Curated annotation (Swiss-Prot):
Family membership: Belongs to the SdhE FAD assembly factor family.
GO biological process: succinate metabolic process
InterPro entries associated with the record: SDH (IPR005631), SDH_sf (IPR036714), SdhE_FAD_assembly_factor (IPR050531)
Keywords attached to this entry: Chaperone, Cytoplasm
Protein name: FAD assembly factor SdhE
Domain of life: Bacteria
Chief site of localization: cytoplasm
Localisation per UniProt entry: Cytoplasm
GO cellular component: cytoplasm
Reported function: An FAD assembly protein, which accelerates covalent attachment of the cofactor into other proteins. Plays an essential role in the assembly of succinate dehydrogenase (SDH, respiratory complex II), an enzyme complex that is a component of both the tricarboxylic acid cycle and the electron transport chain, and which couples the oxidation of succinate to fumarate with the reduction of ubiquinone (coenzyme Q) to ubiquinol. Required for flavinylation (covalent attachment of FAD) of the flavoprotein subunit SdhA of SDH and other flavinylated proteins as well.
Organism this protein belongs to: Psychrobacter arcticus (strain DSM 17307 / VKM B-2377 / 273-4)
């Protein structure tokens, strides 16, 4: 277990964590806390959706998180909304 009670990441999870570092602060606002607090304990399907999400270009991801467009994959769209809802509820507390 790591300091924040997350399990030690596998090599594949480390690769995904590294890929989650983006060049846009708007995306980092969502991705950094998600990686630190939820990613390692998420179900395998959610981790796979997150990995798939990271294959999208930053402008597309920004559009998803600002509701300008949505990904075709319903599981990815559900994850975008989960991360947004979770992150904004953290900001209010």
């Amino acid at each position: 277990m790591t300091i924040n009670n997350q399990p030690e990441p596998t090599n594949e999870q480390r690769r995904i964590i590294y890929q989650a570092r983006r060049g846009l602060k708007e995306l980092d606002f969502y991705f950094e806390p998600y990686i630190k607090e939820l990613y390692l304990t998420a179900e395998a399907a959610e981790q796979e959706s997150f990995a798939q999400m990271l294959t999208h270009e930053d402008p597309d991801l920004l559009d998803y998180f600002t509701n300008q467009s949505r990904p075709e994959d319903d599981a990815m769209w559900a994850l975008v909304n989960k991360i947004k809802t979770w992150r904004h509820s953290k900001s209010l507390s």
